[in-house]
Amino acid sequence: MTEGEGRIQLEPSWKARVGEWLLQPQMQELSAFLRQRKAANARVFPPGPQIFAAFDATPFEQVKVVVLGQDPYHGEGQAHGLCFSVLPGVPVPPSLLNIYKEIQDDLGIPRPDHGYLMPWARQGVLLLNAVLTVEQGRAGAHQNKGWEGFTDHVVETLNREREGLVFLLWGSYAQSKGKVIDQARHRVFKAPHPSPLSAHRGFLGCKHFSKTNEHLQRRGLSPIDWSLPSRAALDLSLAGG
């Protein structure tokens, strides 16, 4: 699969397990579609090198937790390849604000002043959207173009080749995509989507973050530190300071 002038590289541990799917005819059609949209001057998000950022940040054997999203944010500068996450300096989206509220209520962790979730990904939280690209101002513009088959394959591969993962399935879309998960092998937590439209129906109060850590610790694994560095500390680390 190619994007723009160069080939998008999948992180090696993932390439070894799901890379062959990128050679499927539907993925070649998706690649042609992306080139066509860019040639028509469509603003495709996230930028090409960030499309597979979730896999780069969380190699296959390091995955402990999987969060399934739907498709990337479609505003300028928002999407960078991790579901629910935005780059530092971008306003925190409403769904992520509700995620932070639940973490604060569940674990007593103060709400961060940014929406950059890379520290979670580096600890083993795979932040995976079902569809990996979108167009500016057009939510869902790249649905049913081929991404869903690839990310279904990712979920199926994790289900088959790993054990004891935690899957956080928020909303009916994620829960439908997670139907293949063997709950005898993995721990699945379900709740309504954290969107302001549905968070009050059971996402708020779900305690998924403490439950996730309890499961990991029972398996002898280190828990996820759901706190995030301050924006100032983040800027310093990103600047190499």
Curated annotation (Swiss-Prot):
Its main location: cytoplasm. GO terms for cellular component: cytoplasm. InterPro entries: UDG_fam1 (IPR002043), Ura-DNA_Glyclase_AS (IPR018085), Uracil-DNA_glycosylase-like (IPR005122), Uracil-DNA_glycosylase-like_sf (IPR036895). Keywords: Cytoplasm, DNA damage, DNA repair, Hydrolase. The active site is at residue 71. It comes from the Bacteria. It catalyses: Hydrolyzes single-stranded DNA or mismatched double-stranded DNA and polynucleotides, releasing free uracil. Its EC number is 3.2.2.27. GO terms for biological process: base-excision repair, AP site formation via deaminated base removal. SUPFAM superfamilies: Uracil-DNA glycosylase-like (SSF52141). The keyword DNA damage applies. The keyword DNA damage applies. It is an enzyme of class 3 (hydrolase). This is Uracil-DNA glycosylase. It comes from Xanthomonas campestris pv. campestris (strain ATCC 33913 / DSM 3586 / NCPPB 528 / LMG 568 / P 25).
